[in-house]
Amino acid sequence: MTELIKVDEKRYAEPIILDNNIILPGQEETVRLSAGRLPSDNRLYIYAHVYRSVNPGPTVLMMGGVHGDEINGVMVARNMIEEKVFEKLNRGTVISVPLLNVFGFINFSREVPDGKDINRSFPGTMAGSLLQE
């Protein structure tokens, strides 16, 4: 039996705030988020593509590249964005992050430089290691 997800309509009307970017219902936005620094001191970024319907509904987070050596999810997420799959969203919100583990992707590795697996480190902490931030 399928259960319907109840959505608080008042809460849905509130903006989603990602790194000082405000996304309201009915908007779509690509947000650049800091993902750390290289030894050269150059910053690395990840991109979150946020699509919000005007109609309340569930929020789906789609992340590719959690493990840098598994690239299928990266391509699926990118193709869905390029094909504009989410632009006609009837209800709810989709947040798509095509490549989460930039360090692992560059090095074709599951781990980040401190040897940890992102998939074993949720929810993280701002005072933690590179991975936990």
Language-model region placement:
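Structured catalytic-domain cores with a bias toward divalent-metal coordination
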Residues: M1-E133
